[in-house]
Amino acid sequence: MRIFIIFLILIFSNQSLTKADDIRDFEIEGISIGDSALKFFTQEQIIKNSRNDHYTNSKYTPVQNDFFDFFKKYDAVDFNFKTNDSKFIIVSLSGVILYDDKDIEKCYVKMKEIISDLDIAFSNLEQTDIGTSVHPSPKNKLKKSTYTYKYYDFSNGDMISVTCYDYSKEHGSQDHLNINLQTKEFGNWLTYEAYE
């Protein structure tokens, strides 16, 4: 049976979490790594919401889905699939909660609550708390945009991360919390090939 981690529900419950060792056991809005996106979105929606200009290398296609009716906990659910995969198998999945500039502290509070639950659920995984760093985006010329980041590594190289992004007005992006699940293969590609 899948362990359903709907992160924001866990924050408000006193559930005892089972230790997990497979990223496919976790869901964001009922969606998991390894699922076909066609179970949740039409092909037309996937194509319409694809951001084909996001990566330099086109091996994977990112899809940004904002404010769908079935989203209960997140404002957006984003995913990546191999560009030529007609089944649209999800290899990276994110839940996003948006915040106004004046509400960034709410993002940090929510992040701490989620991390507390994840630390229990993933006590068997290697955990790395990066803390707060300057965002590397070319739009961040004044070095005012930051991100706060913690991630959990599975033994097979898959990863879950939690990040709060605090963007400056000059950057032009909206502050948000991001919970991301990704396979090792996708993570390696993202690190070494996506922007070449």
Roles of regions detected by a PLM:
Residues 12, 89-91:
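Short, flexible segments with low predicted structural confidence
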